[in-house]
Amino acid sequence: MTDRVSAGNLRVARVLYDFVNNEALPGTDINPNSFWSGVAKVVADLTPQNQSLLNSRDELQAQIDKWHRHRVIEPFDVDAYRQFLIDIGYLLPEPDDFTISTSGVDDEITMTAGPQLVVPVLNARFALNAANARWGSLYDALYGTDTIPETEGAEKGSEYNKIRGDKVIAYARKFMDQAVPLASDSWTNATGVSIFDGQLQIAIGTNSTGLASPEKFVGYNRQLRSSNWSVLLANHGLHIEVLIDPESPIGKTDPVGIKDVILESAITTIMDFEDSVTAVDADDKVRGYRNWLGLNKGDLTEEVNKDGKTFTRVLNADRSYTTPDGGELTLPGRSLLFVRNVGHLTTSDAILVDGGDGQEKEVFEGIIDAVFTGLAAIHGLKTGEANGPLTNSRTGSIYIVKPKMHGPAEVAFTCELFSRVEDVLGLPQGTLKVGIMDEERRTTLNLKACIKAAADRVVFINTGFLDRTGDEIHTSMEAGPMIRKGAMKNSTWIKAYEDANVDIGLAAGFKGKAQIGKGMWAMTELMADMVEQKIGQPKAGATTAWVPSPTAATLHAMHYHQVDVAAVQQELTGQRRATVDQLLTIPLAKKLAWAPEEIREEVDNDCQSILGYVVRWVDQGIGCSKVPDIHNVALMEDRATLRISSQLLANWLRHGVITSEDVRASLERMAPLVDQQNAEDPAYRPMAPNFDDSIAFLAAQELILSGAQQPNGYTEPILHRRRREFKAQNR
C-alpha cells in the first residue's frame, strides 16, 4: 500500500511529496503550500479537457473503423476517403501562412545543426554520459566500431593495434580535409602545426600553408612551455578540437603529434520519461525526477566500475580557450538538455484525486510530468547554493518534448497546460518551450495547424517514423492486411511524411529559429552503415537527428560538417513536395502477397522482437536496450518499435493472414531463443518452458492478441499493468 499525504484534495504519494518539498522546491522561492494548491487547481481544471481529447480519439477511430468495414471489398477510393476524413473532423482546413514567434531560445536549437541523443532519465549513468556527450573522441569512435573494417590486420584485439590506429588517423585526416581543408596540400601530409601572428600554420615538410578558410581557426589551449596543447577549429557552427601531444602513445606515431581529434557531438540531448523508460508507479517517477533535478543542478553523480576501477562520474565543466587575437572563448561542456514528458494517454498513481463516485482515481501522467519536470528545470536556469553550480539554458528557457499528440487541439491543450504550470511555478509566460513529435497520423495530416497552435512556444518538430508507422497501421486496422514491416520504409506515405515535415517547418519559419529533426538509428553496432546512410537526414534539411549513443553522436557529427544544412534549407524553402493524397496512401498488401514461409518468417521476427523487449521491460524494468534480433543483430528497442511489431501482427490476425494459434506457436518457438540470448544475465528469468507462469510472456501474447483493441495501438496500458503485476508478486 502506497503511503500518501493529503495536499488539498490531492492524495500525493509520500515519496513524491517529500522529494518535492525537501529537494525540488528549495532554491525556487516557491511556497510549498501555494505550490500544492496550484497543482490541485491545474489537475481539477485540465483533467476534463484531457479526458475529452482521449474520447475524441476513440470516436474518430470508431468512425474510421466503421467506414473501412463497410468498404472492405471495394477498391480504395482516395477521393471518398479524403472527403470522409474532412466530414468527421479528422482532416482539418490548413491555416493561412504564418511564421513562428518563439523567443528566448538557445543557439544550440536556433543556430547549430548537429546530433541529438535520446536517453532514459531513470538511468543516472546513461544520463550523465549523454549530457557529457557534447564532445567526443573521433579516434575512439572510429577505433571501437566497424566504421574501420577489421581487415588487413586491423583487428581491434585486446591491446592497441597500430595498423588499426594508423587507419583511424588516416580516416580522421581525410575528414579534416573535408571540414577544415588546407589552402594547399592535405592534412594527410602535415608534419607540424603552429600559430604565427594569430594565424594557424601547418607545416608540409619544409613548406607551410594555412587553412583554406582562415576564419575556421577560432582558438587554442596551451600552457606555457608545454608541448601538450590543442587547436580549436569551427565549421558550419560545430567545433573540432585537435589535441597535440608528441609524447603521448598515439602522438608519438603521428608526424604532427596529434593524439586525438575531438568533435562537438551531441549538441542537444533529450532526457526521456517516455518510450525508453519503465515508470509505472510513484517510486519510478521520483527516481526519474530526482535524476532530472540533479542534471539541472549540476550535482548528479554516479559510481562507475570500469576495468576493475571505481570512479565517480560527474557533469563536465565548460571549456575555455584563447582566441587567435588573445581574447577568451568559453564553450559549453555539456549538451543542451530537453526533457520528454509522456503523452496525454497514461495516468499515474503518484497522485490520486476523488473521481466523483467516491473512488480515488489516478491523475493524468502528462499533467504531472509538466509540473514536476518544469519545477526541477528551474534549477537549470540559475546557479547558487540551492541551485547547484551549473546551468542548462543560457536564455531562460525550459525545453519539453511532447510526444504522441493527435492534431492541433491536443497541441493547444499542451500549450494551455504549460501556461498554467508557468503560473504555478512563478515563471514568465513562454518559459516552457515545446518540441512537437510528428509521430501520429492526425498530426502529420494537420501539421501546419499543429505548429500554429504552438507558434509562440515551438522549438522543434521531429519525425518519429517508428511510432508513426504504428499509428498508420492502427488507424487503418480495418482496411485490410498491411505490408510487411521491412517494406514500410519504402511505402508512399513515409517519403511524403518525411518531406512534408521539413517543408511545412521551413514554411513556418523554422530556419534559424527552431529544430527540424529526424528519427533514430536503431542498429547500435552497425556504425559503418550509419556513417554511410544517416547523412541523408541533414541532406534532407534536418538540423538534427536522433542517435542511440555518445559514440554514434560523434560519428553522426561528421555529417553536419560534410553537409551545410543551412544551405540545404535555403534551397528547400518554398517547396511543397508531398500531397495529402500521398499521405493518405494506406500501406495495404496485395491479395496473396506472401508464401507461407514468408508469413512465418515475419511472424517469428516480430514475436522474437516483442519477447526480447517485453521480457526486460516487465521483469527488469528496462525500457530501452540493445535487443538481439532473430539473427543476433543488436537493435535499440523501445516502446515505439514494440508498437509496430505488435500492431502488424494484430492486423494480420484481424484479417486472417495468421491465427491466434500461429501467434502462440511462434511465441513458444521464439521464447527459448530469447532465453538463450539473455543466458549470461544473472537477473534474467527464462520464459520457457513454463510459458503461462511468465508474466512477461503473457504480456507479449496479450499485446498481439489484443492489439486491435488498444487505444491507437499504444502498448503502455498492457505494459504498465503487467509490470505492476510483476512488482506486486516480487516485493
Swiss-Prot record:
Mg(2+) binds at E439, D467. This is Malate synthase G. Gene3D superfamilies: Malate synthase, domain 3, Malate synthase, domain III. It is found in: Cytoplasm. It comes from the Bacteria. Glyoxylate binds at R340, E439, G464, F465, L466, D467. It comes from Mycobacterium leprae (strain TN). Keywords: Cytoplasm, Glyoxylate bypass, Magnesium, Metal-binding, Oxidation, Transferase, Tricarboxylic acid cycle. The modification Cysteine sulfenic acid (-SOH) is found at C624. Belongs to the malate synthase family. GlcB subfamily. Its cofactor is Mg(2+).
